[in-house]
């Protein structure tokens, strides 16, 4: 399964992305969660991105259907206290 490595995270930060949309979880370590207790400090990519003010929208579907020429992403998360993430409804508007 895909994941972001540190080189990819550094590229995202260096190019000053404001948000990243993925169709997979960003950290490789997330794959260990069913097998063992995974500690917050192990989410190196997660912290690299968030510490630079970049948001993640992950586990999306059908990203290949977006042309990318003139696309607007609208993501509306549920309000949840004490979390750094939440379920959301995400819509891509492709302005041909």
Feature roles, as predicted:
Residues 1-96:
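Active-/binding-site microenvironments in catalytic and ligand-binding cores
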